[in-house]
From Swiss-Prot:
Acetylation of Lys-498 and Lys-538 is observed in liver mitochondria from fasted mice but not from fed mice. Deacetylated by SIRT3. Phosphorylation at Tyr-215 is important for efficient electron transfer in complex II and the prevention of ROS generation. The lineage of its organism: Eukaryota, Metazoa, Chordata, Craniata, Vertebrata. GO terms for biological process: mitochondrial electron transport, succinate to ubiquinone; nervous system development; proton motive force-driven mitochondrial ATP synthesis; respiratory electron transport chain; succinate metabolic process; tricarboxylic acid cycle. The active site is at residue 340. This is Succinate dehydrogenase [ubiquinone] flavoprotein subunit, mitochondrial. Belongs to the FAD-dependent oxidoreductase 2 family. FRD/SDH subfamily. Component of complex II composed of four subunits: the flavoprotein (FP) SDHA, iron-sulfur protein (IP) SDHB, and a cytochrome b560 composed of SDHC and SDHD. Interacts with SDHAF2/SDH5; interaction is required for FAD attachment. Interacts with TRAP1. Interacts with LACC1. The modification Phosphotyrosine is found at residue 215. Pathway: Carbohydrate metabolism; tricarboxylic acid cycle; fumarate from succinate (eukaryal route): step 1/1. Enol-oxaloacetate inhibits the succinate dehydrogenase activity. Its cofactor is FAD. It comes from Mus musculus (Mouse). The modification N6-acetyllysine is found at residues 167, 179, 182, 250, 335, 423, 480, 485, 498, 517, 538, 547, 550, 598, 608, 624, 633, 636, 647.
Amino acid sequence: MAGVGAVSRLLRGRRLALTGAWPGTLQKQTCGFHFSVGENKKASAKVSDAISTQYPVVDHEFDAVVVGAGGAGLRAAFGLSEAGFNTACLTKLFPTRSHTVAAQGGINAALGNMEEDNWRWHFYDTVKGSDWLGDQDAIHYMTEQAPASVVELENYGMPFSRTEDGKIYQRAFGGQSLKFGKGGQAHRCCCVADRTGHSLLHTLYGRSLRYDTSYFVEYFALDLLMENGECRGVIALCIEDGSIHRIRAKNTVIATGGYGRTYFSCTSAHTSTGDGTAMVTRAGLPCQDLEFVQFHPTGIYGAGCLITEGCRGEGGILINSQGERFMERYAPVAKDLASRDVVSRSMTLEIREGRGCGPEKDHVYLQLHHLPPEQLATRLPGISETAMIFAGVDVTKEPIPVLPTVHYNMGGIPTNYKGQVLKHVNGQDQIVPGLYACGEAACASVHGANRLGANSLLDLVVFGRACALSIAESCRPGDKVPSIKANAGEESVMNLDKLRFADGSIRTSELRLNMQKSMQNHAAVFRVGSVLQEGCEKISQLYGDLKHLKTFDRGMVWNTDLVETLELQNLMLCALQTIYGAEARKESRGAHAREDYKVRVDEYDYSKPIQGQQKKPFGEHWRKHTLSYVDIKTGKVTLEYRPVIDKTLNEADCATVPPAIRSY
């Protein structure tokens, strides 16, 4: 893997003592790089003390830098390298440790291997699943690109499960239909048993090794380098040796994943801390729709580990304490394969009404033991293992205790379907020059208010590729990289120094736990105004407590105390925007279910014919995207709104799906 650890080796031999500070100057040292950095294309990286003599900064120059090396980041990075761009990929984890590896169920594409299918039907299902908050131009792009994207993965060597005649096996998944919702259940989810994310990530990583991409592994991105409204790279901390690095680039792609760890119980890795989302917030740019947090119906009770929707796609059913298949009452047609927000709310209602399972009656059961053992062994081997380890359940004999668990963030950094980051000025979308985003960190918005299962892996590969294509359309390899100020990134280093020597009264772990429990209690599956208001006050108070943090490790080498504190800052910014956005949205839509505002508020009442109705003004309905900003010093959240894009990329080829009452 080209470039891994090369930058760390630049400073090796000048390591800090665990409790020491950086020396004021660094002796010159040459180190052979295969990639180009600095003004002299053959020179090694430059060390500058323009920011601080205590924290010398190593400067690098690339055509493009990708932050994050999960599915989206890898696809963007090797797409850029393939096009000839001198590309850096910066990641706080080794690439195959990224959270993409945890995805289980599959990736949607209308291949038609199990029955006739059409990408336009997939488009319809995704728009409906989004509760008409998704942007239909982006959904059009994603669903049309889906079949080719899956074939591309197959050509890269991804070992999909197969039908008897050798085609890619496709299972049923929630919210998927044929013939625009009128043809029954679709089998559209391509899978590798129940380990699809693992296979996808390793396939993309293996593919990336073909290209001359420079990987900065175990580097923590601190902030974007912004000049005159343009993004010109990132500043990062090398976790291994504590060195600071400014990576200057004409194009920056954020692919840092979601912020699931704002909640106490979630299926996300502990590294899902919204780093990119927070960097954009600190840059003064908006985030979009953060109030829409998906609760996956089936997290293992007490552990939060994911049990894939593929279990229900293979024939598993949800039952209550009376042994009743209760989803038949809530979604008579789709039943257990209704969309995730519908199933999670139904489970919560069953528990509330006293039909929960166990001594506390606080969960339900997922039953699989009626399925043939050979089907469980071949299609759901990972789930069988996970259920035994985390619940002590043999799925061939007994049901799995499950509970809705935070799983995915529909909101993120606002982009168009090309991956270009947007801001909204005077009622118009404007592109932020040099900045792109993809994957769960981004909000295109293809998921709207609720994501369909197996659309997330599709999102990664389609929009990771889209970012690379967009950059290739507008730039050429070797284009001049815009300059940055000599002290660019100074505030980031000052913040790092402040946290490193923080000597307050609250531990990072204590404050993080308080935040997570507050989010879990105040912004859950069902929400109510008074509780949300209390949550806003609580999270604002906790944000203020950041100045009272106490860290214990004063060193710079593998200072995990410092890294976790930096992550907590990022989580706090995400939590603030999530709960304030939820309190402000006075309706129920998708994953945002208000008990005091139970109906969806559109520009028309779509439960009735719209003829004769007067369209509500923009300020009086909620079919619009939330844009949130945070004052970093005070924690004050400011909300604005932008309209949903209803037009597709080609109305003649793919007609807009008009809003309707959503039922399954």
